[in-house]
Amino acid sequence: MVDYHAANQAYQYGPNSGGGNGAGGGGSMGDYMAQEDDWDRDLLLDPAWEKQQRKTFTAWCNSHLRKAGTQIENIDEDFRDGLKLMLLLEVISGERLPKPERGKMRVHKINNVNKALDFIASKGVKLVSIGAEEIVDGNAKMTLGMIWTIILRFAIQDISVEETSAKEGLLLWCQRKTAPYKNVNVQNFHISWKDGLAFNALIHRHRPELIEYDKLRKDDPVTNLNNAFEVAEKYLDIPKMLDAEDIVNTARPDEKAIMTYVSSFYHAFSGAQKAETAANRICKVLAVNQENEHLMEDYERLASDLLEWIRRTIPWLEDRVPQKTIQEMQQKLEDFRDYRRVHKPPKVQEKCQLEINFNTLQTKLRLSNRPAFMPSEGRMVSDINNGWQHLEQAEKGYEEWLLNEIRRLERLDHLAEKFRQKASIHEAWTDGKEAMLKQRDYETATLSDIKALIRKHEAFESDLAAHQDRVEQIAAIAQELNELDYYDSHNVNTRCQKICDQWDNLGSLTHSRREALEKTEKQLETIDQLHLEYAKRAAPFNNWMESAMEDLQDMFIVHTIEEIEGLISAHDQFKSTLPDADREREAILAIHKEAQRIAESNHIKLSGSNPYTTVTPQIINSKWEKVQQLVPKRDHALLEEQSKQQSNEHLRRQFASQANMVGPWIQTKMEEIGRISIEMNGTLEDQLSHLKQYERSIVDYKPSLDLLEQQHQLIQEALIFDNKHTNYTMEHIRVGWEQLLTTIARTINEVENQILTRDAKGISQEQMQEFRASFNHFDKDHGGALGPEEFKACLISLGYDVENDRQGDAEFNRIMSVVDPNHSGLVTFQAFIDFMSRETTDTDTADQVIASFKVLAGDKNFITAEELRRELPPDQAEYCIARMAPYQGPDAAPGALDYKSFSTALYGESDL
């Protein structure tokens, strides 16, 4: 065994190894290794993969151990005592490990392996389920897993392309380097490498003299792989880590083995990174510009779609033309509810997302030193907000108008039915009355007949007077239907006019007949008092029964328990009068029986009917029985309505209970979010975490709102129009909920933008807190923005010379144009941070991009399309070629392009 302390301690693996792999390199390793944990979850290795890993990992270890004059033969056995493992770690890290124990006992081996594992862990690596005992026992899975962890940490971790993770960075590097080669499509670290072309393409890209790529065939993978492995071993000092047959004969080569092999190519070619770094800078700048253009196009499209939807929806909400029937109005109400439930919520989310996208775009433009984005005319955020306010204004009161119209139509239907009922009863009563009044029977009647006719006429007049109220009610109902704009008012008016004309005619005929009867009354002597008394008492009683039947069959509409209880009380009062009415009925029938008894006892032959009235005892008994039948039916109808109103009251209280809980909860959350956005408790990440917890709690609260919506739906279906148990309406709750969602999303976006600004500009947490404290001090109304005077006072407090003089005003106007490019008159905290960070930190500039292009151009003042296509990805190379102006300098060559004017245009210093 070679003494590993004699190994070359000055060796450092890769450009970022050594001390960088110590404390500094381990800073992000925890996160990185957590990302790699899911690569090592299998309990058992596939035999083919295990074979590939053994060979690859053994070759990789020997490529480093040979620098210390040693090597391993069996990866399971040679690391069991921990000595070569510690030696390997010293070689690849360039650091000295604790002195190993030289004993041969198991405890000495475990201690040595633990020293190696402790050193790996000190680099920020999570060793999941790997223990010293398994390594000492020669556990193949644990040993291979440990070596893979070492390879990840010391050979792959520092590979980063465009801020990607190690694995993604290595894959992106391979994709870029092999992109120009036919039959090569690197998408992974297994089957993409089976045909060997990708290995040959990597070598040819960096050392084209070593490979004749055009002579390689895709259908000969073994030859391709052996060619690449032999060339790499002979000319690039990369040991052969895999057998071509093992790769070809495996359905899916081992990913870890391929990554280990490919990482050796990456480190071998790392010396060619200067041009790639320059290309990366240009790619990054172009990617930012392309992304910003994409975001601008998305904003314009989304804004146009949202404004078009608002334009189409507002006329529909402003259409307040009432319909003629309840069914039509209920359909309009259902359409409106469908709009609130289905159509509007996605648009609320689109509006919120549009504002977030706009703010994020502006932040990215400021951070990348680009001019502020000005949407096309009519598509500003303020235009969208104005359109949305117009939509809300049109929507306001629409549902209330619909419900009022339904109530109006319901009232109209009730009145129309009541009119038809009363009119039918009146028309039935008047049927034949005109013919009766026009009779001239008194001209040939006897004295007794005349007196009977007089009494009969008096009874008729009494009946006529009793019907006067009904006629007035009919006229009043018709008038109310006219005032409420009943759609069938023409037929109602025609029928009412006919009744009134007939009533006037009856009055005239009644008066004429009375005069004729009174003219002959002096010649009449006797009158049957009993019949007369019967008629006088029977007529009012009959009218009372008709009115009672009419009232008992009258429809009723109530909306509260108090109203139905009032009807029940009135009905109970009516029932209490029935005993007196029954006694009156018996008294009337007794009069009739008395007349019959006298006639029979005196042998008087009666005509069979009372000459003074048409109301017979049979009619009285029949109507009385009808009243007796209608009373329990009325009882049942009132009790059903009482049960319905009790159910409605339960719905009111149920809704009120939920609303009185949801409403204050929303208000409390709004206040807490406002407090969090103003206070400076903890880091921005803490604030963001706190806000996202609030957002999750808000989302988790959505079932309570859905429950309230369901209860509100039940209330609407029950046609309940008021609720005295709560001041919260569903409209208030919906608006509050929408405001809460918008506020939390906007607040989270503000904090994320602050983090983005802080990280991009290198602002410390203490600086961020100082900025927030200064901003809050002058934000007196806690509105989240400063007016010009407040902002000026804040600048003065920070030492800026913006006093009220010509020079100070000019400087202040310059600063305002930076922090408020849209001239809104307000400076947000995000704009304040952007300004302060711009004042205290450096940013990328057009000069840096020009310098990068100069590297790609070989220090020339111009660059050619061929150079761009060789160094940049195809899409970004074509982007530059399409936008670069021809170079006009004296040293111009054919096809020369001006990269300087193009670079300044990227930062708004000139036009593309």
From Swiss-Prot:
Per UniProt, the short sequence motif LXXLL motif occupies residue numbers 85-89
State where the protein is found: Nucleus; Cytoplasm; Cell junction; Cytoplasm, Cytoskeleton, Stress fiber
Q: Name one GO molecular function term.
A: transcription coactivator activity
What does UniProt give as GO cellular component? cell-cell junction; cortical actin cytoskeleton; cortical cytoskeleton; cytoplasm; focal adhesion; nucleus; perinuclear region of cytoplasm; pseudopodium
Q: How does it assemble?
A: Homodimer; antiparallel. Interacts with MAGI1. Interacts with PDLIM2. Identified in a complex with CASK, IQGAP1, MAGI2, NPHS1, SPTAN1 and SPTBN1. Identified in a IGF2BP1-dependent mRNP granule complex containing untranslated mRNAs. Component of the CART complex, at least composed of ACTN4, HGS/HRS, MYO5B and TRIM3. Binds TRIM3 at the N-terminus. Interacts with MICALL2 (preferentially in opened conformation); stimulated by RAB13 activation. Interacts with PPARG and RARA. Binds to VCL; this interaction triggers VCL conformational changes. Interacts with SEPTIN14. Interacts with IGSF8.
| Homology family | Belongs to the alpha-actinin family.
Q: What is this protein called?
A: Alpha-actinin-4
Q: Which organism is it from?
A: Mus musculus
Q: Which gene encodes it?
A: Actn4
